[in-house]
Amino acid sequence: MAKDIKFSENARRSLLKGVDKLADTVKTTIGPKGRNVVLEQSYGNPDITNDGVTIAKSIELKDRYENMGAKLVAEAAQKTNDIAGDGTTTATVLTQAIVREGMKNVTAGANPVGIRRGIEKATKAAVDELHKISHKVESKDQIANVAAVSSASKEVGALIADAMEKVGHDGVITIEDSRGINTELSVVEGMQFDRGYLSQYMVTDNDKMEADLDNPYILITDKKISNIQDILPLLQEIVQQGKSLLIIADDITGEALPTLVLNKIRGTFNVVAVKAPGFGDRRKAQLQDIAALTGGTVITEDLGLELKDTKIDQLGQARRITVTKDSTTIVDGAGSKEAIDERVDTIRKQIEDSTSDFDKKKLQERLAKLTGGVAVIHVGAATETELKERRYRIEDALNSTRAAVDEGYVAGGGTALVNVEKAVREVKGETTDEQTGINIVLRALSAPVRQIAENAGKDGSVILDKLEHQENEIGYNAATDKWENMVDAGIIDPTKVTRTALQNAASIAALLLTTEAVVAEIPEPKQSAPQGGAGAPMGM
């Protein structure tokens, strides 16, 4: 296919148009007075959301050059979401601010490479200062505040704080749809291990790229499955019962994996395959843990069991299983309390007898998985549209809270980014262009607070001017229209979220500013259908 190429100013101007179209859509959602965006769906009702990354991913522009600019900003949002789980709108606002200011200077004749160096220096100084002014998360109230700010709901904040209190900061917390209108928390037997699906064609939710299985059977084995005939009788029985299946095996190779995938795609039955966790003897022990939790039997030669002889009553069961590309979460396994308690006692005795610190650590991890349980947040709402929107907010809040536990928190509402301006001003560029790059980041740091104020119906410049004359952590609370200490008021952002948003915005913006040519495909003209006579129109 033929290509069209744009150079220098023309290329950058087209990219900037795409950046602006996406950012102008996303930034309306930032802050407590942010608006919602309605997204058309290919089928069903439209989605209503204020989740930055969801909006960014859904935007596809008609102009190919503009679309490339939009997609690069969406990448900054997506990377921020992948690392920190939140802050996608902040990343988008910062990217637009840096790109816009940078484009003006490049057009005026500044060297984009020098500007890039200045942007990198300023970003490093800002990130270092963020870590210096960061507070550690030490109480349940602080956890609740982080979650409440992210979700714009004190009820959600309290719910997530309760969940973390019950299963620990590193515990497994999952989010499910409720059958009622209330959002509630429950703790059930369950565990999570670090193994994901063997094929992305096994996913059931394409938006989140995860596979959800309700009331599935679980085949647990330490063997490799390469011949589908070994498990065919078992599969046929599962299909007849209309059940789904999770296979945990050493590996699935040969014809077995494509056969399972084909049956999943055709809708014969819902199946997900994952590799067994751990290695060597630890793998066998972990499989026994899973068997105890789910009421299944490990199919292993150690017990004289063969795959081809496996019966349905040797399979484990659970109320729900969620598999992502990296992990598998088993919720509410069907194992008896006696079997689980016996397994727990065995592991505790092994911990007492162990002389190796490494072995003790691994045994304690297994013990925590068996005894800690899984916190399940059941999200309720009156309509499906409201349910989706509420679920997005709770997922963001949970991710924010985990990020705050990792790296602490700073004053929210864009206040922390303005507070680090002083440290950035102390950075001096070696050249005029470097200094220009530093100044670009300086101006961009105030973009989130401006936008939060404007979304609340205030003049962003007036709010910013007043903020720059306040002490650290004193900021504008857009929710109450008051000036107060943001940390004391519970308006806090995870340091990890703020840091990641700034770093990704600076990285993508620097790439855009140093772009000299853009190549796009020229779409082939559609061939017009031959004109018919005066007869009847053709059918589909």
UniProtKB/Swiss-Prot annotation:
Pfam families: Cpn60_TCP1 (PF00118). GO terms for molecular function: ATP binding; ATP-dependent protein folding chaperone; isomerase activity; unfolded protein binding. Its main location: cytoplasm. It catalyses: ATP + H2O + a folded polypeptide = ADP + phosphate + an unfolded polypeptide. ATP binds at T29, I30, G31, P32, D86, G87, T88, T89, T90, G413, N477, A478, A479, D493. Keywords: ATP-binding, Chaperone, Cytoplasm, Isomerase, Nucleotide-binding. The keyword DNA repair does not apply. Its EC number is 5.6.1.7. It is an enzyme of class 5 (isomerase). GO terms for biological process: protein refolding. It is found in: Cytoplasm. InterPro entries: Chaperonin_Cpn60_CS, Cpn60/GroEL, Cpn60/GroEL/TCP-1, GroEL-like_apical_dom_sf, GROEL-like_equatorial_sf, TCP-1-like_intermed_sf. GO terms for cellular component: cytoplasm. Forms a cylinder of 14 subunits composed of two heptameric rings stacked back-to-back. Interacts with the co-chaperonin GroES. Together with its co-chaperonin GroES, plays an essential role in assisting protein folding. The GroEL-GroES system forms a nano-cage that allows encapsulation of the non-native substrate proteins and provides a physical environment optimized to promote and accelerate protein folding. Belongs to the chaperonin (HSP60) family. PANTHER family: 60 KDA HEAT SHOCK PROTEIN, MITOCHONDRIAL (PTHR45633). This is Chaperonin GroEL. It comes from Lactobacillus helveticus (strain DPC 4571).
